[in-house]
């Protein structure tokens, strides 16, 4: 960056988890005040996160963000204070997600499948570890969680991505197989869960989401 250039000519983009949020997954009030002060003085600031709107907005509603926020790792570009989605990337086809689920289930991993219709939902059949249960507890609080016997979706729902939660040992071979088969079709993120470090997340979206 050229520090002789007016910083107000740049757009500053921050992540949430492991960056702005504290260890309890909250945005401290003193951080809200500092960021708002910078925005009020002309700073162009926004957020890019793997969270969806229902999860991100309660954390960010105190910020005076004027630019659209990037949600779900680039699946949605959204006006923060209205919730209006102004851009969508490509979604994952139903046939494709069926192939992925059939692979994942051979490893005895329970997937969460994200959809978007009129609302955001996360469908799952069950949980088999504390990391996944912790995630269910979180998404149940904002009514996204939908426990089902089989993965079936309405004609109005589009599949925005999927999530696997388990230990690194369990997920590493899943990641290797999916990345080998579908690296041109999927963006795959494999990392430690910042809130439950003994578990890892394998989260994936359409290749055009970034």
Where are these regions (language model features)?
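Conserved acidic, metal-coordinating active-site core of Asp-based
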Residues: 114-210
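Non-catalytic pre-domain segments flanking phosphatase-related domains
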Residues: 1-14
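Conserved hydrophobic "DFG−1" position in protein kinase catalytic cores
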Residues: 14, 77-79, 164, 190
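Solvent-exposed alpha-helices and their adjacent loops that cap or buttress functional pockets
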Residues: 3-5, 63, 152-156
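Active-site phosphate-binding/coordination module
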Residues: 26-135
């Amino acid at each position: 960056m050229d520090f002789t250039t007016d910083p107000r000519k740049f757009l500053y983009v921050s992540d949430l988890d492991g960056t702005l949020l504290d260890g309890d997954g909250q945005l401290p009030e003193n951080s809200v005040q500092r960021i708002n002060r910078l925005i009020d003085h002309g700073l162009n600031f926004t957020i890019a996160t793997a969270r969806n709107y229902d999860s991100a907005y309660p954390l960010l509603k105190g910020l005076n963000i004027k630019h659209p926020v990037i949600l779900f790792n680039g699946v949605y570009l959204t006006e923060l204070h209205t919730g209006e989605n102004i851009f969508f990337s490509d979604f994952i086809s139903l046939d494709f997600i069926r192939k992925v689920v059939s692979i994942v289930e051979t490893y005895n991993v329970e997937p969460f499948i994200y959809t978007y219709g009129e609302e955001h939902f996360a469908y799952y059949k069950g949980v088999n570890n504390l990391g996944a249960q912790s995630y269910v507890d979180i998404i149940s609080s904002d009514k996204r969680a939908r426990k089902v016997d089989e993965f079936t979706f309405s004609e109005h729902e589009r599949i925005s991505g999927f999530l696997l939660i388990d230990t690194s040992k369990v997920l590493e071979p899943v990641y290797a197989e999916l990345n080998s088969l579908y690296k041109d079709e999927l963006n795959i993120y494999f990392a430690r869960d910042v809130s439950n470090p003994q578990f890892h997340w394998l989260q994936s979206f359409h290749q055009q989401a970034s």
